[in-house]
Amino acid sequence: MADRNQRKVYTGRVVSDKMDKTITVVVETYKKHGLYGKRVKYSKKFKAHDENNIAKTGDVVRISETRPLSATKHFRLLEVVEEAVII
């Protein structure tokens, strides 16, 4: 159980909630270019388990690494940090 605290935790935006109990989250990170020093934005999509289907498209959520739940799903929804504003 000591590994539990060392699991990766990411904050990202939900881009899809069309699957049952699954959301797709885009996590954006910035890295410094090695030669020129400019900050470059990288993004990566993760599928996360949403047991109660509470996250909606546009929400900012926090996800945590977990055991493999399917072939592509290795993260679990921890909390909805900020709900999307519907206009």
From Swiss-Prot:
Keywords, sorted A to Z: Ribonucleoprotein, Ribosomal protein, RNA-binding, rRNA-binding
One Gene Ontology CC term in the entry: cytosolic small ribosomal subunit
Gene Ontology terms for molecular function: rRNA binding; structural constituent of ribosome
GO biological process: translation
InterPro entries: NA-bd_OB-fold, Ribosomal_uS17, Ribosomal_uS17_bact/chlr, Ribosomal_uS17_CS
SUPFAM superfamilies, per database record: Nucleic acid-binding proteins
The keyword Hydrolase is assigned to this record: no
Tagged with keyword Zinc-finger: no
Disulfide bond positions: none
Top-rank taxon: Bacteria
Pfam families per UniProt: Ribosomal_S17
Family indicated by similarity: Belongs to the universal ribosomal protein uS17 family.
Entry-linked NCBIfam families: PRK05610.1 (NF004123), uS17_bact (TIGR03635)
Matching PANTHER family: 40S RIBOSOMAL PROTEIN S11 FAMILY MEMBER, SMALL RIBOSOMAL SUBUNIT PROTEIN US17M
Subunit text: Part of the 30S ribosomal subunit.
Protein's job: One of the primary rRNA binding proteins, it binds specifically to the 5'-end of 16S ribosomal RNA.
Protein name from the UniProt record: Small ribosomal subunit protein uS17
The organism of origin for this protein: Listeria monocytogenes serovar 1/2a (strain ATCC BAA-679 / EGD-e)
Primary gene name: rpsQ
